[in-house]
Amino acid sequence: MPSFDIVSEVDLQEARNGVDNAVREVESRFDFRGVEATIELNDANKTIKVLSESDFQVNQLLDILRAKLLKRGIEGASLDVSDEFVHSGKTWYVEAKLKQGIESAVQKKIVKLIKDSKLKVQAQIQGEEIRVTGKSRDDLQSVMALVRGGDLGQPFQFKNFRD
């Protein structure tokens, strides 16, 4: 029986490359000359710290970071940015967490979405991924389109497609 897994993963090497590209652009931009502005990736917690001298500049840095990550194949929805910026001394900063795995609430929404579609497939939650099995490849491809089209606030990848 054909099957595949629905996962939500961020390639940390690509994230590091995107952060490095964003740092390079910030260093060369005129509006950031003489300004303390940094973007740092913490591999251990899978967070990105964006720091600058004003909240407006932090927003600009976030826009640059999102654009560079998108060029590296990481969607902006995989960044979980807190709404409030932290003011510490003369700097402002914000922590953005990279979403890894699918939370249980989102998993339940996906399974409900698949079951409500009346396709002849079964969806099983397995840890941080969802295994979908069905008799025909067409049904599985319909499920892929359904999950991509559903507005669930997170990008998904499909792997382990077996025939």
Curated annotation (Swiss-Prot):
Coiled coil: none annotated. Disulfide bonds: none annotated. The keyword Nucleotide-binding applies. GO terms for cellular component: cytosol. InterPro entries: DUF520, UPF0234-like_C, UPF0234_N, YajQ-like_sf. It holds the Pfam family DUF520. Keywords: Nucleotide-binding. One of its GO terms (molecular function) is nucleotide binding. Belongs to the YajQ family. Nucleotide-binding protein. This is Nucleotide-binding protein YajQ. It comes from Salmonella heidelberg (strain SL476).
